[in-house]
Amino acid sequence: MKKIGVLAIQGAVDEHIQMIESAGALAFKVKHSNDLAGLDGLVLPGGESTTMRKIMKRYDLMEPVKAFASKGKAIFGTCAGLVLLSKEIEGGEESLGLIEATAIRNGFGRQKESFEAELNVEAFGEPAFEAIFIRAPYLIEPSNEVAVLATVENRIVAAKQANILVTAFHPELTNDNRWMNYFLEKMV
């Protein structure tokens, strides 16, 4: 059985754990670098990316997460996770640099501009995925190595590169497990 960690420093940790378990994998909370040992994949949940980065630095998690990815282990970042995994963040904040694109934080607006949208994802077929966007980022300037999986208003909201999967929205807040199934079946 696949073992998936959830970075448990902020955000929708419990919701991701439920989604992982409902997809048939084992879920573990990751709070320290030694918690990464033995995992097949890692989820960086939504939250506030600046706060998450500061906590990751305080607990010395930035380099261990990069090393985890460099071993070919899969990482799935949602919302703030997308921001942290991007090569660059508009404004010059430090990132993990694991997907070759630039993240635009709060790209669709602030909290009051949060919304839901139907996404047609080729890998999923029908029906469309009902995505929940909360202070959502998006990606720009992807390299040729990045596969765009979904867009809203011509903005990249889901993508993958090698062993890294990112979404600008919160699949863990829906009852639709297709993104986690995709991660477990195609990436891990």
UniProtKB/Swiss-Prot annotation:
This is Pyridoxal 5'-phosphate synthase subunit PdxT. InterPro entries: Class_I_gatase-like, PdxT/SNO, PdxT/SNO_CS. The keyword Lipid metabolism does not apply. It comes from Listeria monocytogenes serovar 1/2a (strain ATCC BAA-679 / EGD-e). HAMAP family: PdxT. It catalyses: aldehydo-D-ribose 5-phosphate + D-glyceraldehyde 3-phosphate + L-glutamine = pyridoxal 5'-phosphate + L-glutamate + phosphate + 3 H2O + H(+); L-glutamine + H2O = L-glutamate + NH4(+). The keyword Ribonucleoprotein does not apply. In the presence of PdxS, forms a dodecamer of heterodimers. Only shows activity in the heterodimer.
